[in-house]
């Protein structure tokens, strides 16, 4: 089986890949997935009932969410495990009437599949070649459950997930499982949840705002044009009919697409779909996609059944739900490939062209006129933006909603420019994103919450778009000052919030801002670690991780994850001049054990260059932080993590005898570990490993 991005992020599914390696820029893949375009899925109760009866899934959304992630990877197909069955199914589908049927209409065309690259996104040289998507609930549901405090993520929920996830890791592994890559996968799962959400509608950025609304009809259940029209009208009128509809949302900026689902065994249903699609395009001006969601072979062909895994990116609430009630969902390989073909068309032929059209329109109508008028003269821009009358510029620009909150309206030039920058990030056009963020920053001086997020993503766009080596000068003069300014602005927001909320709990008041600040620092640290010159960039990552430990309100398990990441940072801090010598030195040390006395550590066989090499690493400091992490894991009763931490530092501390003395922390931890039966949890069989008990991991 080819090791993929999904395998790494869900490595507990794929422990047979635990000795693989991942590219250093893996963080860029995760961030691209975390800010991927969001698609809402709307279906009728009748449709959802049909789905539930056929595939044991609650709704169409719950079915399609399995297919979020990298579109080109098609990871749910799990081709290597089914072997020849995939080719048999694909050949059979080529002979059916579904292909010529769909050629008569602009719907997913299976023949397009060969024209698009399906290379593994994990190892692509240019990460921008991959397109990620995320699915979420209907927009009305998101608004009804929206948290009014604008919090990016919940610290407590993140801690609950991590605690249960680590217990699951302990139950499904033993001391013999290679753990180095698995521990990195665990950290990046934690990292992805701290920077991503599919249900948080932030007023300050648009990454989680839906871009496309997929409106589904069940032709097999007799749903017709009138049903489609009513669903579209309800969607378009959400801003009028929904209580507390956010003023920063606009359904007219979302692309509606009809998904017409039918039984592929019925020629009559297919013809109805064709006629309905033409009518919807002619009268409602909305595109349609046909999907053969039902077919006897999809249900009764047990030879090509695939068990689906949870998506890599999902909301924290959904992950916790599947943690408490893990489920197994299976689909036939033919249906899985049909859904991926539909998504290919949806993403590449409808969504991305729509986004590019909107970006071009905003550039021509908002961005270019501003550049032409001021031509980069920041002094004049600041002068024009100032309101000379009593400094009321902020109140004139912001709009108050029904709950008394003040935000930029969806039609304001500031918010549209922010959307232009965010959509450029989603399309991997980092140059346009950076220039737009930079242009917008001067307009947001009076709005610190908006300004902080804008500065943060200006820095992220620089790091994400860095295809060549980022120089020390660029980090020192451009990138790090942006991050420091963003953090200072977030801190200013916290002070303002504390001043407004003197009568309430100050922690409750500042937590929403702190969640953004935490996200900023954890993003910066991972992107610095993804740079090629780790000797230069690692100190910046260390600085932000230490600040997270000092200032952010993380739970104990979350804090220990950061302690371990600090250890990883020091492991990476190797002078580039002697990187090749470190590995050679270690091998030489192993080959010369006979030169060492039984109680004496002799260094006579090392050359001067070896000693120099040993001095230009931070291995001992890395081991020290790992030892701290082991102590803290022991306090949380996470004995598998304690065992792995002690294994990691064994080679570093084996020659330092005094550290093993009675009463010292190392010997205490070993004694505690010996008293615990870390392998007491039942071991799953190789075939059933993680599939039954880890199906919720995202």
Swiss-Prot record:
GO cellular component: cytoplasmic vesicle; cytosol; Golgi apparatus; phagophore assembly site; TRAPPIII protein complex
Main location: other
Any one GO BP annotation for this protein: pexophagy
InterPro entries cross-referenced by the UniProt entry: TRAPP_III_complex_Trs85
Source taxon at top rank: Eukaryota
Cellular localisation: Preautophagosomal structure
Keywords attached to this entry: Autophagy, Meiosis, Sporulation, Transport
Keyword Chaperone tagged: no
Segments of this protein annotated with the region Disordered: 82-125, 678-698
The family this protein is said to belong to: Belongs to the TRS85 family.
Note: Present with 8760 molecules/cell in log phase SD medium.
Role noted for this protein: Specific subunit of the TRAPP III complex that acts as an autophagy-specific guanine nucleotide exchange factor (GEF) for YPT1. TRS85 directs the TRAPP III complex to the phagophore assembly site (PAS) that is involved in autophagosome formation. Required for membrane expansion during autophagy and the CVT pathway. Required for sporulation. Has a role late in meiosis following DNA replication.
Subunit-level organization: Part of the multisubunit TRAPP (transport protein particle) III complex composed of BET3, BET5, TRS20, TRS23, TRS31, TRS33 and TRS85.
Protein name, entry field: Trafficking protein particle complex III-specific subunit 85
Organism from which the protein derives: Saccharomyces cerevisiae (strain ATCC 204508 / S288c) (Baker's yeast)
């Amino acid at each position: 089986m080819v090791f993929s991005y999904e395998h790494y992020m869900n490595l507990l599914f794929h422990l047979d890949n635990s000795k693989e390696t991942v590219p250093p820029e893996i963080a860029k893949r995760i961030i691209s997935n975390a800010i991927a375009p969001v698609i809402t899925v709307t279906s009728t109760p009748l449709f959802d009932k049909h789905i539930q009866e056929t595939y044991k899934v609650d709704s169409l959304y719950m079915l399609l969410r399995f297919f979020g992630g990298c579109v080109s990877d098609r990871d749910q197909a799990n081709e290597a495990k089914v072997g020849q069955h995939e080719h048999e199914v694909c050949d059979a589908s080529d002979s059916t009437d579904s292909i010529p049927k769909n050629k008569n209409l602009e719907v997913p065309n299976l023949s397009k599949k060969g024209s698009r690259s399906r290379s593994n996104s994990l190892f692509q040289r240019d990460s921008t070649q991959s397109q990620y998507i995320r699915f979420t609930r209907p927009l009305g549901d998101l608004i009804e459950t929206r948290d009014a405090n604008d919090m990016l993520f919940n610290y407590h929920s993140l801690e609950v997930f991590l605690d249960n996830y680590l217990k699951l890791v302990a139950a499904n592994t033993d001391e013999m499982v290679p753990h180095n890559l698995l521990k990195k996968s665990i950290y990046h799962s934690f990292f992805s949840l701290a920077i991503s959400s599919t249900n948080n509608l932030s007023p300050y950025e648009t990454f989680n705002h839906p871009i496309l609304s997929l409106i589904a009809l069940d032709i097999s259940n007799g749903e017709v044009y009138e049903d489609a029209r009513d669903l579209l009208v309800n969607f378009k009128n959400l801003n009028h009919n929904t209580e507390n509809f956010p003023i920063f949302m606009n359904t007219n900026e979302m692309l509606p697409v009809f998904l017409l689902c039918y039984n592929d065994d019925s020629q009559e249903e297919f013809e109805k779909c064709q006629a309905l699609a033409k009518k919807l395009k002619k009268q409602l001006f909305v595109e349609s996609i046909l999907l053969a969601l039902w077919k006897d072979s999809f249900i009764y062909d047990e030879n090509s059944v695939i068990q689906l895994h949870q998506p890599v990116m999902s909301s924290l609430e959904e992950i916790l739900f599947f943690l408490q009630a893990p489920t197994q969902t299976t689909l036939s390989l033919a249906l899985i490939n049909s859904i991926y073909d539909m998504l290919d068309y949806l993403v590449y032929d409808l969504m991305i062209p729509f986004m590019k059209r909107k970006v071009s329109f905003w550039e021509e109508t908002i961005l270019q006129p501003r550049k032409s008028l001021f031509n980069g003269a920041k002094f004049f821009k600041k002068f024009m933006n100032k309101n000379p009358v009593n400094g009321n510029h902020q109140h004139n620009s912001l709009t108050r909603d029904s709950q008394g909150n003040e935000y930029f309206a969806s039609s304001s030039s500031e918010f549209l420019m922010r959307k232009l920058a965010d959509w450029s990030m989603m399309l991997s056009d980092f140059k346009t994103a950076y220039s737009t963020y930079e242009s917008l920053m001067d307009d947001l001086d009076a709005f610190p919450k908006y300004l902080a997020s804008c500065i943060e993503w200006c820095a992220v766009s620089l790091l994400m778009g860095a295809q060549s080596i980022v120089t020390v000068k660029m980090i020192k003069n451009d990138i790090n000052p942006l991050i420091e300014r963003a953090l200072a602005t977030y801190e200013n927001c916290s002070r303002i919030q504390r001043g407004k909320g003197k009568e309430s709990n100050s922690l409750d008041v500042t937590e929403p801002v702190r969640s953004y600040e935490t996200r900023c620092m954890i993003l910066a640290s991972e992107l610095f670690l993804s740079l090629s010159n780790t000797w230069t960039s690692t100190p910046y990552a260390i600085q932000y991780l230490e600040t997270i430990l000092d200032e952010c309100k993380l739970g104990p398990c979350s804090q220990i994850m950061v302690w371990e990441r600090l250890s990883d940072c020091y492991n990476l801090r190797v002078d580039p001049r002697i990187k090749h010598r470190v590995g050679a030195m270690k091998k030489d040390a192993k080959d010369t054990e006979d030169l060492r006395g039984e109680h004496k550590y002799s260094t006579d066989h090392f050359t001067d260059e070896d000693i120099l090499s040993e001095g230009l690493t931070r291995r001992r400091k890395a081991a020290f932080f790992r030892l701290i992490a082991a102590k803290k894991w022991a306090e949380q009763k996470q004995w598998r993590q304690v065992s792995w931490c002690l294994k990691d530092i064994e080679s570093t501390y084996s020659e330092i005898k005094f550290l093993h003395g009675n009463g010292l922390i190392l010997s205490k931890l070993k004694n505690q570990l010996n008293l615990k039966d870390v392998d007491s949890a039942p071991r799953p069989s190789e075939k059933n490993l993680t599939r039954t008990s880890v199906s919720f991991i995202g």
